[in-house]
UniProtKB/Swiss-Prot annotation:
Expressed in flowers, siliques, floral stems and rosettes leaves. Residues 25-184 are annotated as: Pectinesterase inhibitor 41. It comes from Arabidopsis thaliana. Acts in the modification of cell walls via demethylesterification of cell wall pectin. One of its GO terms (biological process) is response to brassinosteroid. Residues 259-557 are annotated as: Pectinesterase 41. The keyword Cell wall biogenesis/degradation applies. Disulfide bonds join 403-423. InterPro entries: Invertase/methylesterase_inhib, Pectin_lyas_fold, Pectin_lyase_fold/virulence, Pectinesterase_Asp_AS, Pectinesterase_cat, Pectinesterase_inhib_dom. It comes from the Eukaryota. In the N-terminal section; belongs to the PMEI family. In the C-terminal section; belongs to the pectinesterase family. This is Probable pectinesterase/pectinesterase inhibitor 41.
């Protein structure tokens, strides 16, 4: 109670003092002037007192503080609905509310981190680009969480008047408020030019072209993991694989501990979930990764890795050898968000040599194999297999290298900042009267630093689509949300892709606000001569394409090298 009173007093004082013209390096303006830089100036002005006066950072702090208050209020609203109306609601409606509760918790955490950062940053102090990118990423994810909740409510609880009015309407206003906070942060704190990003102290030396040595022989050779002698002996006896004999820290990945999963009982655990639960909470990574080695086998379980299981690395025996499988889907009452066979939210998660599968089939519609809301997550030498909505790159920053993704409708979707590199994208045979869309990117706000980058990948049909003689139309993507952003660059595009390349979502929705681009692709389906002529479609040059590389889009040189996973930092020369 005392903390609540203190917060309210602070909020009241901020109304009195926040907008007094400050003698800083930033100009003081009215809310009308400041709000012109936001997507919804009218709503933006309603956020602030009418006589307010201040610089963009003062407005930004106030908006973030108010966003945090509203996020906490919304969480309490969801709790009330789940407590009072559970027995009266359908399974899908309860599932949508539970998704909202989970997402609201994440959003509150993101807003706390964002507000604490800007609150200690004076008008004369600048944020490093990596820190500014982190906060812009968190605020982008907060908006994504709101939209995910709203989509779920509109789909699963559309017939419930009380939920529509008690949950959806406040959620819409909160989304507008978060958009204001993101816009003002982008205006006030994000540097105009990107600067060199510092690497972790225990990462490998930076190579501006590629990082390939540590895991290059991961699939079949010795593993470059650095651990204690006891842990090494246990691992090698259980896995029957040797670790690299290399005392040079530059060429090894630091490991704090390791456990094994084996269905025959010879490991530490028989299920992946048990192994995940054994991992330490809230580690900072300085001691290395907690490794879970999953031996070959088919694991029929829905795995959820919570946000507190940081720096977790999961290693399998290879694609189609270590398989995690499930069959949740929307037809059977699950939400799209919660249909995932494998779902991860923990930062700095790494998966290697694994297959993630949803076996629901095309007739069950949305059925997710993998959902990642994990910041700074990496998937290397993995496969993702389903039909509609296979891979849900939900939010935050993600990287996929040498992975195979199979699906039909919107089979790579979400609103993360994500780069796919050296991956194989396999459109497969959908249901009758359906078409294939490889991507459905979900950016809802022009200030979100999100999008899908397909770099040096191969797009070709799966075997079942080949046997159908290409009777199904396949597209590079379609705009799920208003500011959808997807780039294909330096990739091989097979003739399976329609000459127009892209498909509408619904009429002219988003055709002027989306950003779809292609750069220097090859293959019989790569010609841009007959591509769509939408205002938002572009054939770009190398300067523009550089914005969507690992180095610039993910700032990957600052965090990816510690994982040992190979990657190309920039464009191919």
């Amino acid at each position: 109670m005392l903390s609540l009173k203190l917060f309210l007093v602070t909020l009241f004082l901020s109304l009195q003092t926040l907008f007094i013209a400050s003698q800083t390096l930033l100009p003081s303006n009215s809310s009308s002037t400041i709000c012109k830089t936001t997507p919804d100036p009218k709503f933006c002005k309603s956020v602030f007192p009418q006589t307010s006066q201040g610089d963009v950072r003062e407005y930004g702090r106030f908006s973030l503080r108010k966003s945090l208050t509203q996020s906490r209020k919304f969480t309490r609203t969801i709790d009330r609905y789940l407590k009072r109306n559970n027995a009266l609601l359908s399974q899908s409606a309860v599932g949508a509310l539970q998704d909202c509760r989970y997402l609201a918790s994440l959003t509150t955490d993101y807003l706390i981190t964002s507000f604490e950062t800007v609150n200690i940053t004076t008008s004369s102090k600048t944020l490093s680009f990596s820190k500014a990118d982190e906060i812009q990423t968190l605020l982008s994810a907060a908006l994504t969480n709101e939209q995910t909740c709203l989509d779920g409510i509109n789909t699963a609880a559309s017939s419930s008047w009380t939920i529509r009015n008690g949950v959806a309407l406040p959620l819409i206003n909160d989304t507008k408020l978060f958009s204001v906070s993101l816009a003002l942060f982008t205006k006030g704190w994000v540097p105009k030019k990107k600067k060199q990003v510092a690497s972790y102290s225990w990462a490998h030396p930076k190579n501006t072209h590629s990082h390939t040595k540590p895991f290059r022989h991961f699939r079949n050779g010795a593993l470059p993991l650095k651990m204690t002698e006891h842990t090494r002996a246990v691992y090698e006896s259980l896995s029957r694989r040797k670790l690299a004999d290399d005392d040079n820290d530059v060429n090894t990945v630091l490991v704090s501990d390791i456990v094994t999963v084996n269905q025959n009982g010879t490991g530490n655990f028989t299920t992946i979930t048990e192994a995940v639960n054994s991992a330490p909470n809230k580690t900072d990574g300085t001691a290395g990764y907690f490794v879970i080695y999953v031996t070959s086998g088919v694991y029929e379980e829905n795995v959820v890795i919570a946000k507190n299981k940081r720096y977790l690395m999961m290693i399998g025996d290879g694609i189609n050898r270590t398989v995690v499988t499930g069959n949740r889907n929307v037809v059977d009452g699950w939400t799209t968000f919660n249909s995932a066979t494998f779902a991860v939210t923990s930062p700095n998660f790494v998966a290697v040599n694994m297959t993630f599968r949803n076996t629901a089939g095309p007739e069950k519609h949305q059925a997710v194999a993998m959902r990642s809301s994990a910041d700074l997550s990496i998937f290397y030498s993995c496969s993702f297999e389903a039909y509609q909505d296979t891979l849900y790159t939900h939010s935050l920053r993600q990287f996929y290298r040498e992975c195979d993704i199979y699906g039909t409708v919107d089979f790579i979707f979400g609103n993360a900042a994500v780069v796919f590199q050296d991956c194989n994208l396999y459109p497969r045979q959908p249901m009758q009267n359906q078409f294939n869309a490889i991507t459905a990117q979900g950016r809802t706000d022009p200030n979100q630093n999100t999008g899908i980058s397909i770099h040096n990948c191969t797009i070709k049909p799966a075997d079942d689509l080949v046997s159908s003689n290409y009777t199904v139309k396949t597209y590079l993507g379609r705009p799920w949300k208003e500011y959808s952003r997807t780039v294909f660059m330096q990739s091989y595009i097979d003739e399976v892709v329609e000459p127009v390349g892209w498909r509408e979502w619904n009429g002219d929705f988003a055709l002027s606000t989306l950003y779809y681009a292609e750069y220097n692709n090859t293959g019989s389906g790569s010609s841009t001569t007959d591509r769509v002529v939408w205002p938002g479609y572009h054939v770009i040059n190398s300067t523009d394409a550089n914005n969507f590389t690992v180095e610039n889009f993910l700032l990957g040189d600052g965090w990816m090298v510690q994982s040992g996973v190979p990657y190309i930092s920039g464009l191919l020369s």
